Amino acid sequence: MESYKCRVCFKSFVNGKALGGHMRSHMSNSHEEEQRPSQLSYETESDVSSSDPKFAFTSSVLLEDGESESESSRNVINLTRKRSKRTRKLDSFVTKKVKTSQLGYKPESDQEPPHSSASDTTTEEDLAFCLMMLSRDKWKKNKSNKEVVEEIETEEESEGYNKINRATTKGRYKCETCGKVFKSYQALGGHRASHKKNRVSNNKTEQRSETEYDNVVVVAKRIHECPICLRVFASGQALGGHKRSHGVGNLSVNQQRRVHRNESVKQRMIDLNLPAPTEEDEVSVVFQ
């Protein structure tokens, strides 16, 4: 935790407001001392320097700091109220130091460096830390930049490769059916027309084959064959007339068979009213 110390009496306070109220009491006391002539201060400073060289060195450093701050405050145009208060505090601090040296005792915290040196060290540390962080960030940025450059190069290479492929494939038109490549779109169109013609011719041949097969089936269905003599006729009328002939022939054959049967039956029967046949007489003579 940062401690707030008074530069005059070296008391520590909790916050800056308490320190400011304490410094106002010193300012009221030092206002009367500032009205004295500056020659007395220089004489006292010379006496103090002759009596104590260490304190003379510190007081001279503090005076130089006060003079430099007063000069810088004069050069700056827009001075703030805090800056003016700081210069007054430094002057009062110098006068208090001179008084203490004249009285002949030293403060316990005389060897401690002033607050300005501590602030300078802290600012230097902050600057060093900032520089270190910036260097790290810069290194990371360089690395990321390299990666970005590599990515851009790869993208450019891929784009160039694609352009080369497009240049090689440019002016070539490929047929989707047979896979042939043509230089112009017109040639590809003519080639596609030939494919269409082939498709039409194939469709026609398929239709013809289908019609022929249907005709064959119809012809096969229209064949008129005689079941008796296995003769084929073009129409059913011819086949009917042929079948009638087969019916007439069958009738004549049946009649002949019937006549032959009747004759055989008649031969087997003996009629006593009729004379004996001559053949039988001859047979009887032979047996005698």
Curated annotation (Swiss-Prot):
Keywords: Metal-binding, Nucleus, Repeat, Transcription, Transcription regulation, Zinc, Zinc-finger
Signal peptide: none
Gene3D superfamilies, per database record: Classic Zinc Finger
One Gene Ontology CC term in the entry: nucleus
Family matches, as SUPFAM superfamilies: beta-beta-alpha zinc fingers (SSF57667)
Compositionally skewed regions (Polar residues) per UniProt: 37-52
Keyword Secreted: no
Name listed for the protein in its UniProt record: Zinc finger protein ZAT9
Organism: Arabidopsis thaliana
Source taxonomy: Eukaryota, Viridiplantae, Streptophyta, Embryophyta, Tracheophyta
